[in-house]
Design a protein with these regions (language model features):
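Catalytic machinery of carbohydrate-active enzymes
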Residues: 1-396
Length: 396
C-alpha cells in the first residue's frame, strides 16, 4: 500500500524507515502465526487518537463499532486533554488516558521537553502493565505504532496504510484520500468483519449541561434565551484556514440585523481578536471566546439555530447535533474533512492553487489570507444562511 504523506522529504524518510523495519521484522512475520481477527476476543483494547479535536470527533462513530463488536472488552482511549474532556464520560469508553502530543504547528505545546519525554515513558510503562490485547490506531502514524504498540507489548496491532507500517501491523486498511475521515476510521475495523455505518459523530451531553449553558447565555445577554442564536467560529489552529475578519464582521452584522443573537466562539488566545471583531456592532452580538470549556461549547452549539465557521474543531463538534452548519473551506480538502452531518453546507471555491494535502501555507496570499478563502465572498455565506431558513437539512 502506498504511503500517503505528501511532504516529499518526510515521505522519502518514511520509505527508508519502512524498508528497514520490513527487513528487521521479516523473521517475525515468517515465524509468527497470523491471527484470525474475525474470531478475536480481546480482554483489553486501546483506541489511539492523539490528533486534534476534530479528528477525534470524526473517529467517534468507530467507537460505537468497536463497542458493538467487542461488548465484553475493556476499551481504553488514548487522546489529548480536550479529547478526555469530551469523551471521558462516554458510555462506549471504559477509561480515557491522556497524552498531549506536541504538534509542531501549534503556538503552544509544540516541543518535546524533558517533562514531555518523562510523561511519555511513564505512559508506556502504564500501558505495558495493562497488557493490551488489541491496539487500534486510527491515524496511521508510524511513531504511534512503535511507541504505543510495539513498546507497550500490544499483542495485536491494526491501523491504516497512511505511513506504511505494514510490517508492524497484523492488519492495515487502505488510506484512501477520496474518502471522508469518518469512513476511513471505520475501514480500519473491517479486518474484524463487515462494518455497518453507525451514523454521525456523537458526543454525549449530560442532562445538567443543556440548562447550564442556556443559563450562561442568559447571563451574557441579560435576556431570556434567544429563539434565534447563531454561533460564529472564525478561528482555526492554522492561519491558512482563516477567512478574512472583515468578511465575518459583514456576516455577523447581517445576522444581527435579521434578529439573531450572535455569539463568537474561540479559545482564550482568540478572545482579544473576537472582541475586536464585534466592537462597535449594533444588535445582540457577544463573544464567549475563552469563556467556555469544550463541553460547554458542545452544549452551546447543540442549542444554537446555526453555526458558521471555518475548518475548525467547533464545526465537527456541531456535526454531532441536529444544528445547521455553514462550513467555509479553502486550503483543506472538504471531501476528507468536512463536518460529517446532513445539516452541513460546505462553501468553497475551485481557486486553490496550493497543495491542499499539505495546507501549511498559501503561496498566493491576498491581504494576508489564503487566496482561495479571500475569493469566497460574504454574499455566498449569506446565501447559504438564507437556504438554511428554507430547508435546514440538505441530505439524509
Amino acid at each position: 500500500m502506498a504511503i500517503q504523506i505528501h511532504n516529499k522529504k518526510k515521505g522519502f524518510a518514511l520509505k527508508i524507515v519502512n524498508a528497514l523495519i520490513s527487513v528487521l521484522y521479516f523473521p517475525v512475520r515468517v515465524l509468527s502465526k497470523k491471527p484470525e481477527l474475525s474470531k478475536l476476543a480481546p480482554e483489553k483494547i486501546l483506541l489511539l487518537r492523539l490528533d486534534h479535536i476534530g479528528d477525534v470527533v470524526m473517529t467517534s462513530p468507530a467507537f460505537s463499532s468497536v463497542r458493538e463488536r467487542f461488548p465484553k472488552s475493556k476499551i481504553l482511549l488514548l487522546t489529548d486533554t480536550v479529547g478526555q474532556q469530551l469523551f471521558g464520560e462516554d458510555p462506549r469508553i471504559d477509561e480515557v488516558l491522556v497524552y498531549n502530543w506536541p504538534w509542531v504547528h501549534q503556538k503552544k505545546n509544540n516541543r518535546f521537553t524533558t517533562e514531555k519525554v518523562r510523561e511519555l515513558l511513564m505512559l508506556i510503562r502504564r500501558l505495558r502493565h495493562e497488557n493490551i490485547d488489541l491496539l487500534i490506531d486510527f491515524r496511521g502514524d508510524l511513531r504511534f505504532i512503535v511507541l504505543f504498540g510495539i513498546l507497550t507489548g500490544a499483542k495485536i496491532r491494526v491501523s491504516n496504510s497512511r505511513c506504511g507500517n505494514n510490517s508492524l501491523l497484523h492488519a492495515s486498511s487502505q488510506y484512501d484520500v477520496s474518502k471522508h475521515e469518518v469512513e476511513r476510521s471505520l475501514e480500519v475495523l473491517e479486518c474484524f468483519g463487515p462494518q455497518d455505518n453507525p451514523g454521525r459523530p456523537r458526543i454525549y451531553l449530560t442532562e445538567r449541561e443543556i440548562p447550564a449553558i442556556r443559563k450562561k447565555v442568559e447571563l451574557l445577554t441579560g435576556e431570556a434565551f434567544p429563539n434565534k442564536l447563531a454561533i460564529i467560529a472564525p478561528y482555526s489552529s492554522k492561519d491558512v484556514k482563516s477567512w478574512p475578519a472583515s468578511y465575518f464582521s459583514e456576516v455577523i452584522s447581517a445576522l444581527s440585523a435579521d434578529g439573531y443573537t450572535v455569539i463568537v466562539a474561540g479559545t482564550k488566545d482568540d478572545s482579544e481578536d473576537a472582541q475586536l471583531m464585534i466592537s462597535g456592532m449594533n444588535g445582540k452580538v457577544y463573544s464567549l471566546a475563552g469563556e467556555t470549556s469544550i463541553r460547554e461549547l458542545a452544549a452551546l452549539v447543540s442549542v444554537a439555530s446555526m453555526v458558521v465557521g471555518v475548518d475548525t474543531g467547533v464545526l465537527h463538534v456541531a456535526a454531532c447535533f441536529d444544528v445547521p452548519i455553514v462550513a467555509i473551506f479553502g486550503s483543506t480538502r472538504s471531501i476528507e474533512f468536512r463536518p460529517y452531518s446532513p445539516f452541513a453546507r460546505i462553501l468553497e471555491t475551485s481557486t486553490c492553487r496550493c497543495n491542499q494535502f499539505l495546507h501549511d501555507q498559501c503561496d498566493y496570499p491576498v491581504n494576508g489570507y489564503a487566496e482561495c478563502l479571500a475569493t469566497l465572498r460574504p454574499s455566498q455565506v449569506l446565501k447559504a444562511i438564507a437556504e438554511i431558513k428554507l430547508n435546514p437539512i440538505i441530505s439524509e
